[in-house]
Amino acid sequence: MVDIIFNSSFLGDMGDHSKKKSGIAMCVGCGSQIHDQYILRVAPDLEWHAACLKCAECSQYLDETCTCFVRDGKTYCKRDYVRLFGIKCANCNIGFCSSDLVMRARDNVYHMECFRCSVCSRHLLPGDEFSLRDEELLCRADHGLLMEQASAGSPLSPGIIHSRSLHIADPVSVRQPPHRNHVHKQSEKTTRVRTVLNEKQLHTLRTCYNANPRPDALMKEQLVEMTGLSPRVIRVWFQNKRCKDKKRSIFMKQLQQQHHSDKTNLQGLTGTPLVAGSPIRHDNTVQGNPVEVQTYQPPWKALSEFALQSDLDQPAFQQLVSFSESGSMGNSSGSDVTSLSSQLPDTPNSMVASPVDT
C-alpha cells in the first residue's frame, strides 16, 4: 500500500523557469502536455491535469483538499482504496475503522467480536490459549480434541474439520488489542510454557523461604543446583510467594479489626463487653440493724375530721381527747384538755383544714 499526499503548486511566473529547468510537463493521466496555469502534482514527481486527477472507481475529482492513493497506475480516493485494498477482518471480511480495536493472530487481524473459535463459537478473550489452523481459530478444548483424534488415527468429523491437514499450530496467547488509531502488522510471540513444580522442589523452595524470604544471588544459585529450575523460575516463585503472603497478612489484619469492631459495637452503640456469671441463690435476710417504723398523724388532721362531723357523741369526743393527750410532748394534763376544747370554734362546721408543714 502506497500513501501519497496530495499537494498543489501554483506556478505563475515561475512556470517558464520550471519548464526550462525540468522540461515540458506531461499529464500522467492522459499523456498530453499540460498547458494549464495550475498543475496538480502528486508526490514525488507525478503531474496531472485538474480534470484528469480523479478516482478510478467513483470518478470523484481529487484536489488539494483530499488524500490521493495510487496503485497499479490508478488513482483512488481514500474510501475506495480502503474498501478495495485495506486490511479486512479474517472472519467477516469487513474493513476496520480508525477507532476499532483489533485482535491479532500472526498475520490475521480480527474484530473483537469476530475473534471466536470456529468450532464452538466461544469468544476468545485476552489470556485464552488458541491455535490457528488453515486460517481458522480453535480454542484449547477443540484443539485438544483434534489432537486426540489425530493421535488415535480416527477419521476426522467433516462437520468440524473441512479438508484440513493434521498439522496444528502451537497454541499462543491472545494479546491485548493495541490502542492505536490505525491497523498495522506486528510480530506475535508465543506464550512461555507453564512450569509445574514437584513436591521435592516445592519443599526446598518453601524451606528456603521460611528461612529468608529474600535470598541473595548466592542462595539462588544454590537453589538452581538443588532444584534443577532456571533462575527466572526461582525469582518469579519468590516474588509470587511474597505477594501472596502480603495479601494474606493484610486480609487477616482487616478480619481481626472487623471481628473486634463487631464485638464492641452493638446496634451502633460502642460499649464494654460484659460476661454473665453463674446464678446465685437470693438471700432474704437483710444485713444491718433493724429500724422501727412508727406511724405519726398530725393533730390538726384529727381536729379537722372532728370539726366536720355534724353530730358529736361522747365516745368519739373522748377518743379525740385521748389522742390529743397522747400526741402532746409530755405537758398534757386535765387542764390541757379544757384549754384545748376552749380554743375550738363555736360552730364546728365553719372549721376548714389548711395544710401544715410537718
UniProtKB/Swiss-Prot annotation:
Molecular function per GO: cis-regulatory region sequence-specific DNA binding; DNA-binding transcription factor activity, RNA polymerase II-specific; metal ion binding
Gene3D superfamilies associated with the record: Cysteine Rich Protein (2.10.110.10), Homeodomain-like (1.10.10.60)
Major place of residence: nucleus
The cross-references to PROSITE patterns, in alphabetical order and at most eight, read: HOMEOBOX_1 (PS00027), HOMEOBOX_2 (PS50071), LIM_DOMAIN_1 (PS00478), LIM_DOMAIN_2 (PS50023)
Record's GO cellular component terms: nucleus
Here the segments flagged for biased composition (Polar residues) are: 336-358
* Limits of the LIM zinc-binding domain: 27-80, 89-143
Localisation per UniProt entry? Nucleus
| Pfam families the record matches | Homeodomain (PF00046), LIM (PF00412)
DNA-binding region(s), chain positions: 190-249
One GO biological process term is:
neuron fate specification
Record InterPro entries: HD, Homeobox_CS, Homeodomain-like_sf, ISL1/2-like, ISL1/2-like_LIM1, Znf_LIM
Q: Which domain of life does the UniProt lineage start with?
A: Eukaryota
Give UniProt keywords alphabetically: Developmental protein, DNA-binding, Homeobox, LIM domain, Metal-binding, Nucleus, Repeat, Zinc
Where is the stretch described as Disordered?
325-358
Q: Does the keyword Transcription apply?
A: no
* Comp. bias regions, Low complexity: 325-335
Job of this protein: Binds to one of the cis-acting domain of the insulin gene enhancer. May be involved in subtype specialization of primary motoneurons.
Name assigned to this protein: Insulin gene enhancer protein ISL-2A
Species, as recorded: Oncorhynchus tshawytscha (Chinook salmon)
